[in-house]
Amino acid sequence: MNDFLLLLLVLFLGVPRSENHVINLEECFQEPEYENWLATASHGLTKTLNPKKIVIVGAGISGLTAAKLFREAGHEVVILEASDRVGGRIKTHREDGWYVDVGPMRVPQTHRIVREYIKKFNISLNPFRQTDENAWYLIKHVRQKMSANNPENFGYQLNPNERGKSASQLFDETLDKVTDDCTLQKEKYDSFSTKEYLIKEGKLSTGAVEMIGDFLNEEAGFHNSFLISVMDHFLFLNNSFDEITGGFDQLPERFFKDMDSIVHLNSTVEKIVHINNKVTVFYEGLSTNMRLVADYVLITATARATRLIKFVPPLSIPKTRALRSLIYASATKIILVCTDKFWEKDGIHGGRSITDLPSRVIYYPNHDFTNGIGVLLASYTWYSDSEFYTTLSDEKCVDVVMDDLVEIHNVSKDYLKSVCGKHVVQKWALDQYSMGAFSTYTPYQITHYSQMLAQNEGRIYFAGEYTAHPHGWIETSMKSAIREAINIHNA
């Protein structure tokens, strides 16, 4: 049993139910080594007396974090990055007078490792408001302010004991039942999809499940392992968030500034040969094929990108199966750049509106630009909701979300076209380097694959958000990098 799953079992068997049924499960999901990783982020690795030659594949935040630790400890490091920039899925679109984060856009208060690096680099933060009572629900053709807090208006067919409760309350109560009654092994909880658990164990009505899917935006992820939904739900429920003032790309750029000489951009790794105590990395640069010989290799590319590399000898069958089986979520952001911040006429400043229309979730800006422009995340979707947009042109995507905004904000489409003349569309499923937005697990995959995905193969090590928990966060990428930096440093 790996440490993560052991913690889950301890969580379900040993955490008492609070009076308000609100348990900070995020802390329970932290690995036992977390405080050590945080200390390493703060103070670095010990100085080495035996410098190693290390090649890192990928200049995303995981690769950059590991490289910084290695260099400061005295190791010789080279990073090979296939694209023409650093940061990976941390990506900020910039134009004159405004910017928008098309990748990560918030940092939870509990993510102390990423905050440690933000502090080290003296990067400023400002609050990211997750909710605003003046924002809207538009679900089942019913439009209602969030402040109304009256779910019965939406006409879900609920059991008597479910009526008058919010979607969050209904979800929380299914978790309280697990905490109170669970005597089962970890495999049972990983064996459920979220929807299956809510119906079979939570004993919720079809209407209650639909309500959770709509209001908590869980519907597109109902196929995930129930444990993934637990982690996501409580991370958002019990957290405050911040954003990086001026754009998230500042974080990888600060890493890059300190070690630009060791980062080789436009360098695609094609083959890795592991013989005895040396690893040879073959890669294609802009004009020629090259190779590097190293003592160790750390692969921080996504699982899908890793499958494009030829390994000699091949990776083990269990490792290959885990990489092949891992699911990657699609995610799409559709951004409108507006000269009139029409949402402020509704009293909305930050937060989000939620709808069952294709837009699903609309996030309002938490910062202003001196030129008065408002940059609206008019649709943020993932899983099947995101796949809806994949084959559409950017112009059609914008047309769809404008239709939704007409209904949500009671404005005309002609008005929206006149004030929101620019747009940005990011479809992570089509990104040729990440090949998806973030990893996730379907039932049984935590049990079967989580440990193997993080396991090294001889002198080849693996890091990235898919090798740790919870998936899809900068913090996860960083702590996986620290984990493997320690392992290689001590090897």
From Swiss-Prot:
EC annotation from Swiss-Prot or TrEMBL: 1.4.3.2
The protein's name is: L-amino-acid oxidase
Which species does the entry assign this protein to? Ophiophagus hannah
PTM text: N-glycosylated.
Q: Name one Pfam family in it.
A: Amino_oxidase
Among SUPFAM superfamilies, the record links this protein to: FAD-linked reductases, C-terminal domain, FAD/NAD(P)-binding domain
Q: Where does it mainly reside?
A: secreted
Class in the EC hierarchy, top level: oxidoreductase
Q: What does this protein do?
A: Catalyzes an oxidative deamination of predominantly hydrophobic and aromatic L-amino acids, thus producing hydrogen peroxide that may contribute to the diverse toxic effects of this enzyme. Is very active against L-Lys, L-Phe, L-Leu, L-Tyr, L-Trp, L-Arg, and L-Met, moderately active against L-His, L-cystine, and L-Ile, and slightly active against L-Gln, L-Asn, L-Ala, and L-Val. L-Glu, L-Ser, L-Pro and Gly are oxidized very slowly. Its activity on platelet aggregation is controversial.
Which cofactor does this sequence's record say it needs?
A: FAD
| Span of the signal peptide | 1-20
For this record, the Gene Ontology CC terms, alphabetical, are:
extracellular region
Q: For this entry, list what GO says about its biological process.
A: amino acid catabolic process; apoptotic process; defense response to bacterium; killing of cells of another organism
**Glycan attachment points:** N122, N238, N266, N410
Task: Quote the catalytic activity from the record.
Answer: an L-alpha-amino acid + O2 + H2O = a 2-oxocarboxylate + H2O2 + NH4(+); L-leucine + O2 + H2O = 4-methyl-2-oxopentanoate + H2O2 + NH4(+); L-phenylalanine + O2 + H2O = 3-phenylpyruvate + H2O2 + NH4(+); L-tryptophan + O2 + H2O = indole-3-pyruvate + H2O2 + NH4(+)
What does the record note on quaternary structure?
Answer: Homodimer; non-covalently linked.
The family assignment reads: Belongs to the flavin monoamine oxidase family. FIG1 subfamily.
Q: List the disulfide bonds.
A: C28-C182, C338-C420
Q: Where in the cell is it found?
A: Secreted
GO MF assignments: DNA binding; flavin adenine dinucleotide binding; L-amino-acid oxidase activity; L-lysine oxidase activity; L-phenylalaine oxidase activity; toxin activity
